[in-house]
Amino acid sequence: MDLRAWTNLEERLGPTVEKLQGRLNEDQQLRAFTETGIKEHVLFGWAAAGHEAGMLCSVGNGRVNIRSGQVTDAAFVLSALPEQWQQFYSSSPEPPFQSYWGMFGQNIHQEGVEVRGKMDLFLALAPIWRRILDLSREAFCGPIEEEGPSNLTTDNLVGRYVYVDLPHWGRTKLFYEQSGDISKPAIIFLHTAGSDGRQYHGVMNHPDMLSRCHMTLFDMPGHGRSFPSETQIPGCHSNNEDAYVGTIAAVIKALGLKKPIVCGASMAGHVSLAVAIRAEEVGAGAVIPCQAAEFTDMERNHWSRSPFINQSLFTPEYIYGMMSPFSPQRERNLVWHTYSGQAFGMYHGDLDFYFGGWDGRGRVEKIDTSRCPVYMLTGDYDWSTTPELSAATARKIPGAKFKKMEGLGHFPATENPSRFVRYLAQAVDYVVEEMKKSP
């Protein structure tokens, strides 16, 4: 299609106004985001960079009205190049065009994408404009064909609490869950920043994993169902490599796990690399880092800690667009839910490790894969830690393996457990065979 058609979004999307308005009126999620006591109407818009003809949306308490027109008077405008909007408005969007957040960027910064106007309103209304853009795409090109969710009817996990003395944080009442065949190789799963172990229920109930491994997950201190440490001050959480690696080592020891495989995504993928570096200290047998790299080199914002932003709304919105648009909606909703339900400061404090607290540059090259095999996995829809970053890290580790996961994003274990297990099972089989060769 001629890109000139996307310079004027008023003309390109204007014919969908009636259809879009109908979807906005009927959408339960949007209603939940807008029936929140909004006192003053906010007008926002989206348009092609350098052009004022676009789409406008007036947001009030329980009411959203859409129209096409000049975006000059909008409080804020979501702007992108014509070719970027063209890719966004696709029934099969390529990464990172599944989300305006992906276009806005971190490690994939899209030149030409910017938010014009009042940034505070852009952040405050993040769940509203995100949902409206999703529905606008649906009105233009139809719904994205997502994969079906898993239909498990039996749960195999057993959960308990254990007191563990942790370096840095001290004595903590931690929650953990286990499933699988105790006679099979042990694997311990680590959740992402600002979330909890519920992320792995789909994986830990999957038949291919139940027959393959003895699986353990635990919630980090103050996350999910784990209690804060006895010294934790509300809002003061901060994570670093020594605290994180020390916690993993302490849990492995407390639960009597024998040379487990350590697997996690995002910050947990980063720490899996740290575990490989310090494998003897931790007692780990192998690692499967997901969505991981030797260093996260990007500018950090502090939106996740601002007292002017509703963290239970903003944090899940910020990470929502990191997932594949083809992942089952029910599973993506679970990711949103777990990120909405954590205590203030936990996500921000975990990012202290993700942003600069982890630095494997000049260190990952020294990982001895004959003693701790490494198999890295990264989903192609992740715009935070991209497959290219993970692959570059894997190439620096002698003997490491890397696989790009098609149709998965930043939260592979949660957003689409069945698809993820196809890759995870291969990784487990590989590292288990390599562990048999370890001295």
Regions found by a protein language model. Name each.
Residues 400-439:
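Catalytic active-site module of serine/aspartate enzymes centered on a nucleophile-bearing elbow/loop
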Residues 273-314:
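Flexible "cap/lid" loop of the alpha/beta hydrolase fold
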Residues 1-155:
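Feature captures hydrophobic
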Residues 216-261, 422:
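Active-site loop/oxyanion-hole signature of alpha/beta-hydrolase fold enzymes
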Residues 370, 376-378:
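Short beta-strand/loop motif that positions the catalytic acidic residue
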Residues 380-385:
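Acidic catalytic loop of the alpha/beta-hydrolase fold
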Residues 298-299, 312-368:
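Conserved alpha/beta-hydrolase catalytic His-Asp/Glu region
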Residues 168, 172-228:
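Conserved HGGG/HGGXW glycine-rich cap/lid loop of the alpha/beta-hydrolase fold
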